Amino acid sequence: MIPAPAAGVFTRGRMAEDMTESQGAPYGKPETLVERLDALYEYEREPVTADKLHGWRTFIAMFSSEHIAGTEFVLGTLLVGHGVTAFDVFAGLALGNLLAVLSWALMCAPIAVKERLTVYWQIRKVAGPYLTVLYSGLLALILCLLAGAMVSVSTTAVAKTVGVTSPDYTAGDRIPSVPWIAIAVGVGTVIAVLAVLGFEKLAHFAKVVAPWMPFVFLSGAIASLPTLGVTSLSDFWQVANEKIWTGTAKPGHLQYGFWSCVGLAWLCNISQHMGMGDVTIFRFAKKWQMGFCSAFGMFLGHYMAWICSGIMCAAFEQTELAAGVLKPNPTPANIALLGAGYAGIVCVLLAGWTTANPTLYRAGLAFQVATPNWRRWVVTLVAGVLMIVIACIPAVLHFLDRIVALYGLFFMPLGAFIFIDVWVFPLLGLRKYYAEARRLLISWPAAVGWFGSFGICFALYAKNAQDDFYSLHWINDYLPTRLANYEADVFSQALPAWVLAVTLYTVCSIVQQKLAGPRPAAASEEAPAS
């Protein structure tokens, strides 16, 4: 779901990280928070040189292997529980994933190829070092949460093997059993220790095991179809609407529809494409058109895999109900075992593991800014402890679809600012990278655009939320009738949030730059002193 850097693509950056760890900062020991973060990324502030660029095969392989995670078992199952129709799934996910691919190809990749800088330095130039520090810290927390969700998925595989019942996250179970917690702690500890030992070997292992995972999803779904009564291809659409995606939400689930599917597929990785997180990897691309390689990940991982896991979920529930089980528990391990046997169990275990490891690695790097005297392995281990705690909370999986949506909406504005700075500001006669040019510690237009856009969109969603944010219903008392009656689906907030963010940022930037007088001289290639 959330991709990690591919092995071999970031050799220069990782070599630099090792040098930073063993030798310290290049210009003496950094003391301030900003200097520590700058030192961590010091060797990545220069644009990528031509000899480091990669071709189509690298990016096709990367997206194909890194967007099938253990959480695909969860998200496909949640769509079944939220009562979408077959049309919603097939058409909605197709449109949402197409929008995601176009966002990578037309927004993220062109800027990455033009600037050849990491997202850290892009945000540093636009928003100033203080907001960049905040971005890194909050991103680390979110990455720990996502890694914890992936550990939970792997834990269901181990628990199934040893006969321990997993919490029913689709029913909203909050408290797991003590044996399940013990297994989650054990699985999380193994993942944390392996992440501490090194990233390159783990990334290589992920690239070796990942290619067969799509076949497990596909074969499991095909094998499950007879259980649902599908005897020929002509039966599928009727069965899909009657027994899989029925259009009726299960108790305790919100009703989703076509636009929910579109929004979820688009928002799932919005921090990477519209949020510009993947400029860090596409800066190594020879051409911006390589952004279309994202289609291999989206339509394998977030289309085919979600549909297949939904089919396996429905087949498992029907089998359990036929056996007299009143409350089927469609955990990733349960549905995979029914559809693909023990190959499915292995797939669940590895799909969670191979994605949790690099996610935890990235969280450790982001946390490192606040721990100047700690070695990287200690920071990664601390992040691992947080990951393990989160893995023991089943509610994370129950709300995973909304978590990834809100996470994407929160980080997306910073990417929007980069897009506007690079392409729009020159047309408006404004200075791009103004915070860098003026050596500002914080860009107040970026702060207003970031927190203003997310705050407004979150409030519009939460004020009428049916199950989560009752305490925010009071907002309606202070709104005009039209706004008070407006009900915003969190999955439909991507475009409004982007427009609102760039509008606030652009208007505030015009005020800032016009009040400051003449345009500043162009910033040097070196990042400004803080």
Where would I find each of the regions flagged by the language model?
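Juxtamembrane transmembrane-helix boundary signature
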Residues: 27, 94-127, 135-151, 316, ...
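Membrane-interface loop-to-helix entry segments
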Residues: 187-238, 292-298, 403-416
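C-terminal membrane-solvent junction of multi-pass transporters and transport-like membrane proteins
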Residues: 418-504, 518-524
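Hydrophobic, membrane-embedded alpha-helices of multi-pass small-molecule transporters
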Residues: 54-73, 224-228, 241-314, 335-357, ...
